[in-house]
A protein has these predicted regions:
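Hinge/lid segment of periplasmic solute-binding proteins
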Residues: 103-155, 179
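Extracytoplasmic/periplasmic substrate-recognition and gating elements
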Residues: 62, 293-359
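Conserved N-terminal structural module of periplasmic/extracytoplasmic solute-binding proteins
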Residues: 2-19, 23-107, 124, 352, ...
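Extracytoplasmic ligand-binding clamshell segments of periplasmic binding protein
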Residues: 217-294
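C-terminal capping/gating helix-and-loop segments adjacent to ligand/active sites or protein-protein/ligand interfaces
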Residues: 359-365, 380-435
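Extracytoplasmic/periplasmic solute-binding protein
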Residues: 145-149, 179-237
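Short helix-initiation/N-cap motifs at beta->coil->alpha
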Residues: 76-84, 103-104, 175-179, 256-270, ...
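Short, solvent-exposed loop/beta-turn-alpha elements that line the ligand-binding surface or hinge
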Residues: 36, 119-130, 197, 214-238, ...
């Protein structure tokens, strides 16, 4: 599930949209004007971004204003995008554009009739600038509703170069090599991996990368849609692979018990903090921001990554997430809203944020030179190279009761599995029982 703003403190504020949300803030309005197509109009936008992300997206909105003459008003909803936007739609005060972070939310909004299909121009831009898989994740029943503007690459293993050098190993190319490197790191005096078991979503990401590589994209899609059961042999195999790592002594900082008491920021600290306990931490590209901003690491020098390696004979996985721009039917400025989404589909818009940093785009036409450092370029290139084999975070596609609720569903069951990984088949059975209930609901 979504985790970007989990690193931020929560403040209850009154949103301009008329609801209360964690992480929200006062709306920011940009000035338009001039003799331009949308002069005198205002486009209201709602999304989860706050802090540096909101500031950088504002630069994109400013570029839109300069191009069209429209004013823009952005309101941060915190992590409660679906709740805040949904309540305002039902209350007759919808924003013009919303940025939704989950496929399931986009599908929910579309099926309720809240979204306007994107224009022919937006469709053409997506066909030209994006791999087909991104159009698929933005579509419901054959109509395109969502434009994926910002992506997250969740198949990156971050490491301390000093730790790997001390162990005498180089970044691995296969999962088998990664385990061998992990044992060498452990033998050199550090634990191999920091695992944020307190945050169940990190465990779903571990599973998804192993499963996508082992079982392949077709099976991944079937499991994401619950077209096959979680008791399928492919699931048991992936759990067995993951369980072997969890269970091997010395590979996890603090052991299984310690991992269950470690949250995501804590796992990054265990590798990149002042007193390192581990050499590697698996999670998405957002690890870099924590390592840099909280622990003063220089990305590409004393904090690096390697792609999550291929498992068995499979292909190296690319699991992603992203934020899709949608146009609300009940918004007051349909023309301006559609123009904004059409702008977001361009490499010009993506380039604005790419230059600001903290951003990866699935837009294949974005010049990689726009990114400010080689590490981000590598991450972006990997996402583009994956093409249609990239897959969206599976738990973000599932009903929240199964894939996105703390203390229940997949999060809780994989925490139980981390605690005791001795019976993958039993865990698969419990996952299937929880999934069946959630998907029926």
């Amino acid at each position: 599930m979504r985790r970007r703003t989990m690193l931020l403190s929560c403040t209850t504020v009154a949103l301009a949209l008329g609801a209360t949300a964690c992480g929200g803030g006062d709306p920011v309005t940009t000035a338009g004007g001039g003799d331009k197509p949308l002069s005198g109009q205002t486009v209201s936008v709602a999304g989860s971004w706050s802090g540096a992300e909101q500031k950088n997206f504002q630069k994109v909105l400013d570029a839109f204003s300069a191009k069209t003459g429209a004013k823009t008003q952005f309101t941060s909803t915190g992590d409660n995008v679906s709740t805040v936007v949904g309540s305002k739609i039902e209350g007759g005060n919808a924003p013009d554009v919303a940025l939704v972070p989950q496929v399931g939310v986009l599908q929910q909004f579309a099926k309720k009739g809240w979204l306007k299909p994107l224009s022919a121009s937006a469709n053409q831009a997506v066909d030209t600038n994006y791999a087909d898989v991104w159009k698929s994740y933005g579509s419901v029943d054959g109509s395109l509703y969502g434009l994926y503007f910002k992506a997250a690459h969740k198949s990156t293993v971050w490491y301390s170069p000093a730790a790997l050098e001390q162990a005498g190993v180089k970044p691995p190319k296969t999962y088998k090599e990664m385990l061998a490197s992990a044992r060498a790191v452990s033998d050199s005096g550090l634990s191999a991996f920091a695992v944020a078991g307190e945050d169940g979503w990190t465990l779903t990401d571990w599973f998804e990368n192993i499963y996508l590589s082992q079982a392949g994209p077709e099976k991944y899609d079937q499991l994401a849609a619950h077209e096959i059961k979680w008791t399928d042999p492919s699931v048991v195999k992936a759990l067995t692979t993951l369980g072997a790592l969890f269970n091997e002594k010395g590979l996890i900082a603090g052991g299984q018990k310690g991992a269950l008491g470690t949250d995501f920021p804590g796992s990054v600290e265990q590798v990149f903090g002042p007193d390192p306990e581990a050499g590697m931490v698996y999670e998405g590209d957002f690890v870099a921001g924590v390592a840099k901003d909280q622990f003063g690491r220089t990305i590409g020098e004393d904090a690096e990554f390697f792609p999550f390696p291929a498992v068995d004979s499979g292909r190296a996985p690319v699991v992603s997430g992203g934020d899709a721009a949608v146009v609300l039917k009940d918004g007051g400025n349909q023309k301006g809203a559609m123009a904004l989404v059409e702008f977001l589909a361009t490499p010009e818009a993506a380039g604005v944020w790419a230059e600001a940093g903290g951003f990866v785009s699935p837009n294949t036409k974005l010049d990689l030179a726009k990114y400010g450092d080689d590490t981000t370029r590598r991450i972006a290139q990997s996402l583009i190279d994956a093409g249609d084999s990239a897959r969206f975070d599976m738990s973000d596609q599932a009903p929240a009761a199964f894939g996105g609720t703390k203390g229940t569903g997949e999060w809780k069951l994989l925490q139980d599995f981390l605690r005791d990984p001795s019976d993958p088949e039993a865990t698969a059975g419990r996952l299937e029982a929880a999934a069946a209930k959630a998907y029926q609901g």
